[in-house]
Amino acid sequence: MELTELTGKFKSVLNIEKICDAPPKIMQTITSGANDTLREWVNYFPDLSEDQLQSIFQYYMADRKEKMQDYTSKSLAKACAVTAGISNAKTCYDMCAGSGALTIQAWNINKDCYFICEEYDERVIPFLIFNLALRNTNATVIHGNVLSGERFKAWKLTSSKHFSMIMEISPPKTVSVDVCISNPPYNMKWQHEPFMQLDDRFNLYGLPPESNANYAFILSALVSAKRAVLILPDSVLENGVKSEREIRKAIVKNNKIDSIILNPDNMFESTAISTCLFCLDNNKSDTFVEFIDMSNTYIEETREQKGQIGSKCHTNRIYKKTVKVFSNENVDAMLQAVKNRTDTAEFAKSSSIQDIKSFEFSLNPRKYIEFVYRESKHREYKEILADINKIAIEKNKCKLIINETLAKRLGFDISLYKNENLSDDPLENLIQKITGDKLIKHDYIQFTKNKNEFVFKNNCADSVSTILISIIQMWKQHIMYLNEEENKYLLEMRDALLPDLMSGKIEP
C-alpha cells in the first residue's frame, strides 16, 4: 500500500491527527487490555507476514543522524533469520529490534519461538509491542541500551485467543537464547563505562574502540546466543583500527565465525551502503568459514510513493525507487552453501582458519572465492591503434598557435597540453611493444610568447581540416549576420541624412 494511504489508515485506527502522537497513544491503547484497535488494524491489514508499521516509523520518525536508524528490508530480514537457524530455535533474541522487522520474518518461519526484543529508542518500542501483540506472540520486549548493558523497562507478551496480553515486568539481567538476529546501528560512536573491560562480552576479546560500536554489537550477540547473525556494513570485514583487527583475529582463532555473506548494495530504501551477514556460532562442528558473495545475486523491485510535503505538484507526484532484494531462490542458495560448505567459483568458498591467517585475518569473501578468468573478445591491437592514429591525424590537421597569456585567459590548461607527448608514457611504450607501431604524436596546439598571437593553421597539404571547415562555416555565418546588422544601420543613417541634405540643413 502507498505510504500516504497507509498513514491515513494508521491515524484513523489510533484516532490521532499527527504521527508524533502515535507512541503514547499506542501504549495507552494496548496496555489497557482493549483489543478494538488491534482488531481494527487486522481488518485493514489481514496479512500479518508484512510489517506495515515499519514504513510509517521509518519515514516519519527514524533518527538516521544520531541513532543510525535505517530499517531492514523484508528479504534481507528473512535471509538473516534463515541463516541464523530460526526454524529449529526455541528462543530468539532480536538485538536492536526497531519496529520488529527481523522478528516478524523470524515469526513467519517459526511461530512457536519465544522472542526477546531489545530496543533503545523509546519512541519505536510502542510500534514494536503493537507488532508483536498483533501476531499473538509470546515475547519479552526490553527497553535497554545494548552497548552499556543498562535495562530500563520490560514488558511480557503472552499469547491468548486473538492477541497477546501485555504486562510490564522487571527487565531481565541477562539474555541467553538459541539464536540472535540483529541489524544494529552502523558505525556508531559509543562510550566505555568504568571497568567495562571486565564485562563478559569484552574480557576475552578486548574493548572495541569508542569511535565505532560495530564489534561491540558483535561481541554482545556472541555472549547472548548459541548462534547469531548480524547485518553489518562490510567495513567490519577487514582493516579498521588496531583493537578491531585484534578482536576479529581472536574471533577467527577461537573458531566463532560460521560464515560471512556479502550482500548487494542498495538493499535499503534510505542508503546504498554495502552490507554483509556476519554469522557467529558458539558450537561449530568444523574449523572452516563459509565465504559467500551474494553481491550479484538478487532481483530488483521498484517502490512507488507519493510526495509527502510541499505543493500539489509534489504531493500528487509518484516517486519511484529501485532496490535490490533476495528472491526465495536466492535465500535457499545461500542457506545450502552455508550448510554444505560449498566451493563454487565466483559464489562460495569454504576456508580454513589457516587460510584466513594467510590473508591477515581479513574476512572479505572476495579474497577467498575463486575468480574465473574469461578471455575478453576484442579487435586486433593493430586495428585499434590505427583508429587511434586516424583521430590523431585529424586533430593535427588544424593547429592552433596562441599566445600563452591569452590561452590562460581562455581557460586552456597549458601544462596538460605540454604533458601530452611525454616520451616515457608507459601506455605508449606498451602499445609499441605489442603492435610494433607507434602512437602518432599530437601536434595541434602551440603556445608562444608573441603578444596577442592567435592563429589557426591548416597543417595538411592534401586536405583541409574538418575543424577548420567548421570554423570557416561559423565565421561565414557570423560575418553574414554582422553584414546584415551593418546594412540595417547604414539604411538608418541614409534615412536620417536624406531629409537634412534636401532641406539644406547640412551641406554635402
Question: What annotation goes with each model-predicted range?
Answer:
Residues 1-110:
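Class I S-adenosyl-L-methionine
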Residues 69, 117, 206-210, 240, ...:
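Alpha-helix N-cap/helix-initiation motif
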Residues 69-73, 347-351, 443-446:
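Short coil/turn segments at secondary-structure boundaries
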Residues 72, 213, 271-273, 485, ...:
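A generic structural signal for residues located within well-ordered alpha-helices
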Residues 74-182, 187-191, 233-235, 246-247, ...:
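Conserved S-adenosyl-L-methionine
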Residues 155-158, 174, 181-413, 417:
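A conserved structural/catalytic subdomain of Rossmann-like adenosyl-cofactor enzymes
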Residues 374-508:
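Amphipathic alpha-helical coiled-coil/heptad-repeat segments
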